[in-house]
């Protein structure tokens, strides 16, 4: 089957992947007067007295906006907000299927940070959370930061943090197989965009001490005048050995390679130069940084990719539905680092020691335990870290 052609055919048939369904019966004049006028005036007046009542008297408690400007859609790049709509609808369908979260696509016709921030802020009173999606770096960092400062509901850029949570979960289990610890490993990352930077920060928060970050020009190091502000910040907290040079140089002696970059940029020789039993997550799509068979031939102990046709798919769908479910259930004001760390360990825990092997480091996407397990861990972390409001 040609997936691309079949998907296009199905999208014409579906004419959209989501719809609004009424939660209340409206079959009589009495039903109408309760759900709408005149009865609806009473909940309106209650909310006027206390805006937080909107979480109890409306569906706001379960609503998430999936927002994009269409500038970094999948591997397609800057295709515009309307062209990004099929992805946003798909994301909303996944929210419902895997987390029972009601999500709506919001595609914004602007590339201006202040316009986007203002647009999202102005509608934030209708939602319990905001999921930012497919917004190009470095603008995505600024948008997320400004929204977190302005809004009192969770702001979560899934391309950054969802990816980071899954990578960490996969790494936790991979390290069990090779008998190494987070605080002992040397990690090399290729790709310093939204996902790469978020992964690096998340791993540092989880106890990894030695991370070297590379971009298309080579190793990111302090004092490099070409770096933008975000990369300068990363240079301060990574590459503590002050390495210089190329990705090839960085990978020598590394325990872990994480790629969020370009197809075919890692060779068999580069894998052979790594430490014993290296772990490689080659997540470039559709063609990974190195094909799994080549990596394993070169000595890789564990290989993950972003693809579903290889073992160990690094797939955000394991994370974002449960993360938002947990955040919404306790009306969290933020999705903080403690909650993301909890999500990583929760996902990793769903693969038992008996099941764990080099081709099975993460649970399957359709494992019914995932959403509930992640949600419970995230909710607990929110309560313990003080961002839960109920």
Where are these regions (language model features)?
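Glycine-rich phosphate/diphosphate-binding loop of Rossmann-like nucleotide-binding domains
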Residues: 74, 79-99, 157, 161, ...
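Short, acidic/small-residue loops that bind anionic groups at enzyme active sites
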Residues: 150-166, 280-285
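Solvent-exposed alpha-helices and their adjacent loops that cap or buttress functional pockets
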Residues: 12, 55-60, 96-97, 122-124, ...
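N-terminal ligand-binding/catalytic initiation module
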Residues: 1-155, 381, 385-389
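Adenosine-phosphate binding glycine-rich loop
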Residues: 158-159, 282-390
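Rossmann-like adenosine-cofactor binding region
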Residues: 232-301, 307-309
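General beta-strand structural signal in soluble alpha/beta enzymes
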Residues: 105, 131-134, 155-158, 189, ...
């Amino acid at each position: 089957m040609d997936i691309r052609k079949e998907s296009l055919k199905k999208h014409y048939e579906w004419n959209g992947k989501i719809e609004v369904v009424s939660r209340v019966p409206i079959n009589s004049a009495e039903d109408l007067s309760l759900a709408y006028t005149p009865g609806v005036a009473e909940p309106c007046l209650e909310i006027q007295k206390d805006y937080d009542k909107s979480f109890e008297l409306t569906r706001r408690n379960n609503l998430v906006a999936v927002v994009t400007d269409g500038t970094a859609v999948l591997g397609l790049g800057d295709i515009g907000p309307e062209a990004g709509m099929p992805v946003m609808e798909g994301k909303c369908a996944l929210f419902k299927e895997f987390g029972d979260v009601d999500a709506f696509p919001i595609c914004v016709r602007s590339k201006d940070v202040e316009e986007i921030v203002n647009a999202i802020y102005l509608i934030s009173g209708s939602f319990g959370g905001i999921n930012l999606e497919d917004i190009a770096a470095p603008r995505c960092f600024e948008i997320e930061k400004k929204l977190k400062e302005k809004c009192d509901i969770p702001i979560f850029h899934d391309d950054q943090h969802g990816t980071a949570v899954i990578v960490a979960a996969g790494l936790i289990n991979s390290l069990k197989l090779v008998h190494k610890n987070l605080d002992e490993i040397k990690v090399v990352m290729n790709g310093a965009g939204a996902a790469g930077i978020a992964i690096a920060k998340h791993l540092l928060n989880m106890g990894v001490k030695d991370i070297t970050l590379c971009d298309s020009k080579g190793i990111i190091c302090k004092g490099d005048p070409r770096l933008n502000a975000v990369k300068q910040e990363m240079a301060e907290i990574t590459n503590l050995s002050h390495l210089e040079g190329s990705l090839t140089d960085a990978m020598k002696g590394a325990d872990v390679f994480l790629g969020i970059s370009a197809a075919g940029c890692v060779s068999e020789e580069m894998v052979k130069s790594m430490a014993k039993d290296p772990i490689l997550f080659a997540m470039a799509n559709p063609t990974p940084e190195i094909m799994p068979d080549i990596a394993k031939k070169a000595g890789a102990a564990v290989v993950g990719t972003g693809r579903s046709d290889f073992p160990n798919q690094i797939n955000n769908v394991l994370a974002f539905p449960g993360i938002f479910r947990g955040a919404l259930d306790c009306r969290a004001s933020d999705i903080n680092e403690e909650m993301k760390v909890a999500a990583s360990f929760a996902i990793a825990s769903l693969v038992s020691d008996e099941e764990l092997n080099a081709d099975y480091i993460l649970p399957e996407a359709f494992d019914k335990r995932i959403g509930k397990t992640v949600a419970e861990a995230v909710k607990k972390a929110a309560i313990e870290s003080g961002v839960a409001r109920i």
